[in-house]
Amino acid sequence: MTGIQLAGIRVGPIIGVAADPNYVAAGAPLGMIATDPDDPTDPWSAAAPPGGVIVQTPGPTAGPSATGTLRIPVPKNVPAGPRRVAIQAGHWKSDEVPDELRRLIPQTGAEWEGVTEVEINLDIAQRVGVILNSKGIAVDILPTTIPVGYVADAFVALHADSDGVGVNSGFKMAHGARRGPYEDALLNDIKDSFGGATGLNYDPTHISRNMTGYFSFNWSRFQHAVAAHTPAVILEMGYVSNDDDRALMLDHADLLANSIASGITKFLDETPRSKIFGQDLVVPAFPSRPSPRP
């Protein structure tokens, strides 16, 4: 059996990974990707995630631009019992990050007219947690620092943006690349629920590399990241710099929290754990550089 194709990610059967001659142990280098344009002295080098990977090089008939693939084993610590979800409150405890995330320390989030992004993020994250708990779902409210190789049935990072002038309005979402095949479903379920409940317009124009390359998604750059199998998305709930968006996030936090929880539960109902963690992932090698923002 050579695997199947799901949403652009090839999925294959579990094998004895440690015995494979191309196995790279957790934390071992996978080679340099590029240099950071903001700091050329700090090369962006990929490292194998917890559980390691198998490096599959291009075959003899591959074209000159082929880069091979990385085979990521199913995590050994897949949750048992109730479904488990992580809600990350963006920028919360950013001053407590480990050394590999040291560049995130000064990034404390947006602020406008005395209202901070982190207080909005944490408040709504906690409300989402209470709602999910009431449905029998186990919830981890996470700060900036993600547990090493974090594994759950879903991960949602909550943020609020600012344009610095108070013009932009709306919400936006993204997920990373070189991850599992179920992130589009998680994103769309939350997007539909959140947009329908809040009336906010979706703002795809301002989805940035900081979102698609969000550090928590980037298992090849950071050990403190979400495991590749775990469906993970980032939600920018609105613009703290916009009077209407800010009022919505402050005065109608329960509305936002319920809509986020509704999207998550829809995803969980339609995506059993056995599908998420049923097989190894095979993803393209050499991930893109991650974002430096929390």
Question: Which residue ranges define each predicted feature?
Answer:
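N-terminal secretory targeting signals
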Residues: 1-77, 278-294
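Active-site histidine-acidic residue metal-binding/catalytic motifs
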Residues: 46-155, 160-162, 169-171
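Solvent-exposed loop/turn segments at secondary-structure junctions
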Residues: 91-94, 117, 145-149, 160-165, ...
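Soluble non-cytosolic domains of exported or imported proteins
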Residues: 111, 115-123, 180-185, 247-258
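Sec-exported extracytoplasmic/periplasmic mature domains
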Residues: 126-137, 160, 191-199, 254, ...
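Surface-exposed patches in mature extracellular/periplasmic domains of secreted proteins
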Residues: 135-147, 198-209, 271-280
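Catalytic cores of processing enzymes, dominated by hydrolases/peptidases
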Residues: 154, 181, 185-234
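Active-site-adjacent mobile loop/cap segments within catalytic or ligand-binding domains
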Residues: 161-167, 174-175, 208-294
